[in-house]
């Protein structure tokens, strides 16, 4: 164990194990998660190949092998609970993206959300056993987030009771679905439904694309891999072109919308019901943002405690770089953000489960807010985590650029989340659409509930400058209630500004669509403010439920740091709205620096509490034992370029050149 890391852990003011229990949901969850992790670590079939030294084809093969082993082992160990499956996959796949992943994250959830009982009976068991390997084919070459623009067609033929699937243009070719290129034999395809000469919009169809047994593409199907990408090298993101490809009528998922044998269309109770899978995945991505940012913080903070560089006082030993205030200012707000997103991820997951249960009983009243909240928070958390991971990499100096640090892989694997499952700016605008509707309802005298209830205060003009002039004297920068209120006022103000600017554009005889585009920067700002408020509120609301005083104190400081750092970064909004004064902004900045000092003794223990195994981090710099330099040298020796003392290119190109000189 590196002596600096041993000293850091001994200096902590709390027991990290207690925070691990909180993050896992309970001590029993922690026990069970570790039990599952040990099943893998102690299994001779579990091999961890260093993906950094593999070709793309090798990475794909290893990932497929791991996926197959994973399914066999889950059967062997009797792992069936969704949360336990997630724990198992995380450690078993390590830093490999699984080519069969969309079978579990999209194909099966879509069957559950949109399939009838008969359809679930037909396809669920084979897909769980990987007889059917499914993917989710929505995105096309020419359209992604704009679903209405998708061009793939499914035309119903009542004579044969079949749908005829076509990719009528180059831009209509399905493009990007994970696992489509080489792995999947079925896809849930989103296509424009045409029956009796009329188009009824997007619907989901279960489409066999490869023959089971031979795995060869079926007639009428053109399918393949789209080529190398920024990351995800082991994932076979693919393309799919369909030419007059016929599937039975029963392959349309018909839990909500239906097509009768004669071609009659039966519309769903709500069009939003078909967005179930996207809402599920977006809610999952909030937790994924927390996980990825936590990994990067763990690596950067441990390494910053091990790395000694430069000097603060002359003639003294080189300090740990974690002692530099600038390093703390880079990393500790990100650590606080990782914790905020952990609690937010759990909140959104529980909210999704609760509302999904209500939807199952026919109550759709909370669906619009759930749709808006998951869209906005998906964008807010993935943007923030994406930038934070890169900040962690740069905080590791030159070694952060090496794949040995593990952070480049975390970054390239996470960054697509800013565009997949809805491009982030468009997601923010979806949230804004909901906020504008709520604003209009409040203006017409209706009281609203949920996370937007703060807009009820607008008609009383409590957010107008003359009314808020007294507010600055009440702001207590050490009170989380007071800071949550400040975020609430910022959100309300920016929602109102966006709404009034939108109305002004419409009153200038602009069409609603043009007015929306001309107000879109304000609308995104309003959504971001709403999401920021929700995050602060969820984090602050979690603290009173924590029993241990030492743990509560540490997390309270992180929550304060998260809230105050956000105010300093968005200072213009708080100052313009007279929510805080210039003098208070100076206090905020001073308090942030104090909180860095307070957090410093607990920084390593706080990342230890995430409880990542070294094999999960895949990092030489972020090792639990802190033995960085010895292992960095050993890692470099594994480079394929070092297999020979003299590379063959020397004999081919350099030696002939030198002999002629």
Swiss-Prot record:
Entry-linked CDD domains: AXO (cd01150)
Localization: Peroxisome
Site, as annotated: Cleavage: 468-469
Tissue specificity: Highest levels of isoform 1 are found in liver and kidney while highest levels of isoform 2 are found in white adipose tissue. Isoform 1 is expressed at higher levels than isoform 2 in liver and kidney while isoform 2 is expressed at higher levels in brain, heart, lung, muscle, white adipose tissue and testis.
Record pathway: Lipid metabolism; peroxisomal fatty acid beta-oxidation
Cited Gene3D superfamilies: Acyl-CoA dehydrogenase/oxidase, N-terminal domain, Butyryl-CoA Dehydrogenase, subunit A, domain 2, Butyryl-CoA Dehydrogenase, subunit A, domain 3
A GO CC term assigned to this protein in UniProt: peroxisome
Assigned keywords, A-Z: Acetylation, FAD, Fatty acid metabolism, Flavoprotein, Lipid metabolism, Oxidoreductase, Peroxisome, Phosphoprotein
Short motif Microbody targeting signal, span: 659-661
Recorded catalytic activity of this chain's protein: a 2,3-saturated acyl-CoA + O2 = a (2E)-enoyl-CoA + H2O2; hexadecanoyl-CoA + O2 = (2E)-hexadecenoyl-CoA + H2O2; dodecanoyl-CoA + O2 = (2E)-dodecenoyl-CoA + H2O2; octanoyl-CoA + O2 = (2E)-octenoyl-CoA + H2O2
Phosphoserine: residues bearing it: 26, 649
Effect of a null allele: Severe microvesicular hepatic steatosis, sustained activation of Ppara, spontaneous massive peroxisome proliferation and eventual development of hepatocellular carcinomas. Null mice have strikingly increased levels of both n-3 and n-6 very long chain polyunsaturated fatty acids (over twenty-four (24) carbons long).
Annotated positions of the N6-acetyllysine modification: 65, 216, 255, 267, 272, 437, 446, 500, 512, 637, 652
GO biological process terms held by the UniProt record: alpha-linolenic acid metabolic process; fatty acid beta-oxidation; fatty acid catabolic process; fatty acid derivative biosynthetic process; fatty acid oxidation; generation of precursor metabolites and energy; hydrogen peroxide biosynthetic process; long-chain fatty acid biosynthetic process
Cofactor field: FAD
Positions of modified residues (N6-succinyllysine): 89-90, 159, 241, 349, 437, 446, 512, 542, 637, 643, 655
PANTHER family named in the record: ELECTRON TRANSPORT OXIDOREDUCTASE (PTHR10909), PEROXISOMAL ACYL-COENZYME A OXIDASE 1 (PTHR10909:SF250)
Protein name: Peroxisomal acyl-coenzyme A oxidase 1
Lineage of source species: Eukaryota, Metazoa, Chordata, Craniata, Vertebrata
Gene of this entry: Acox1
């Amino acid at each position: 164990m590196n002596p600096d890391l041993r000293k850091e852990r001994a200096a902590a003011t709390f027991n990290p194990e207690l925070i691990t229990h909180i993050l896992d949901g309970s001590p029993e969850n922690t026990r069970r998660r570790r039990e599952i992790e040990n099943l893998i670590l102690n299994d001779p079939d579990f091999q961890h190949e260093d993906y950094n030294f593999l070709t793309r084809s090798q990475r794909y093969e290893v990932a497929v092998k791991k996926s197959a082993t994973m399914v066999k082992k889950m059967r062997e160990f009797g792992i069936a609970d969704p949360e336990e499956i997630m724990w198992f996959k995380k450690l078993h796949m390590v830093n490999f993206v699984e080519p069969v992943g969309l079978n579990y994250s999209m194909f099966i959830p879509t069957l559950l959300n949109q399939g009838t009982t008969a359809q679930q009976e037909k396809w669920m068991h084979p897909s769980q056993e990987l007889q059917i390997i499914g993917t989710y084919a929505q995105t096309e070459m020419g359209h992604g987030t704009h679903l209405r623009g998708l061009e793939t067609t499914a035309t119903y033929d009542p004579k044969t009771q079949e749908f005829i699937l076509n990719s009528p243009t180059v831009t209509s070719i399905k493009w990007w679905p994970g696992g489509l290129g080489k792995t999947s034999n079925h896809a849930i395809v989103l296509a424009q439904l045409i029956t009796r000469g009329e188009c009824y919009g997007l619907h989901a169809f279960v489409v066999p694309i490869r023959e089971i047994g031979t795995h060869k593409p079926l007639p009428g199907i053109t399918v393949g891999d789209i080529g190398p990408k920024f990351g995800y090298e082991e994932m076979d993101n693919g393309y799919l072109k369909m030419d007059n490809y016929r599937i039975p009528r029963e392959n349309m998922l018909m839990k909500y919308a239906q097509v009768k044998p004669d071609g009659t269309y039966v519309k769903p109770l709500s069009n939003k019901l078909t967005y179930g899978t996207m809402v599920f995945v977006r809610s999952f991505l909030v937790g994924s943002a927390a996980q990825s940012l936590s990994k990067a913080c763990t690596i950067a903070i441990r390494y910053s405690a091990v790395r000694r560089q430069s000097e603060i006082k002359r003639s003294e030993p080189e300090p740990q770089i974690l002692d530099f205030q600038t390093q703390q200012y880079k990393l500790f707000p990100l650590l606080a953000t990782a914790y905020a997103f952990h609690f937010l991820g759990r909140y959104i997951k529980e909210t999704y489960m609760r509302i999904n249960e209500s939807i199952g009983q026919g109550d759709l009243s909370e669906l619009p807010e759930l749709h808006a909240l998951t869209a906005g928070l998906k964008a807010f958390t993935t943007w923030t985590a994406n930038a934070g991971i890169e900040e962690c990499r740069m905080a590791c100096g030159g070694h952060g650029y090496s794949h040995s640090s593990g952070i480049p892989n975390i970054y390239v694997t996470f960054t697509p989340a800013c565009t997949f499952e809805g491009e982030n700016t468009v997601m923010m605008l979806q949230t804004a659409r909901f906020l504008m509707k709520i604003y209009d309802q409040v203006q017409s005298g209706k009281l609203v509930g949920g996370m937007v209830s703060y807009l009820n205060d607008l008609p009383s003009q409590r957010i107008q400058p003359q009314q808020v002039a007294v507010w600055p004297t009440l702001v207590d920068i050490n009170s989380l209630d007071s800071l949550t209120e400040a975020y609430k006022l910022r959100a309300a103000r920016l929602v109102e500004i966006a709404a009034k600017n939108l109305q002004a554009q419409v009153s200038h005889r602009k069409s609603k669509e043009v007015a929306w585009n001309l107000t879109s920067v304000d609308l995104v700002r309003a959504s971001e403010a709403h999401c920021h408020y929700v995050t602060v509120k969820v984090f602050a609301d979690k603290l009173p439920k924590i029993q241990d005083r030492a743990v509560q104190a540490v997390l309270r400081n992180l929550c304060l740091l998260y809230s105050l750092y956000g105010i300093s970064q968005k200072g213009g909004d708080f100052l313009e709205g007279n929510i805080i004064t210039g003098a208070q902004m100076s206090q905020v900045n001073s308090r942030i620096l104090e909180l860095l000092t307070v957090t410093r003794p607990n920084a390593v223990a706080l990342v230890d509490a995430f409880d990542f195994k070294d094999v999960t981090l895949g990092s030489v710099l972020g090792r639990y034992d802190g033995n960085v330099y010895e292992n960095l040298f050993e890692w470099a020796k594994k480079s394929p370029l070092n297999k020979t003392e003299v590379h063959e290119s020397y004999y081919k190109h350099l030696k002939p050149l030198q002999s002629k000189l």
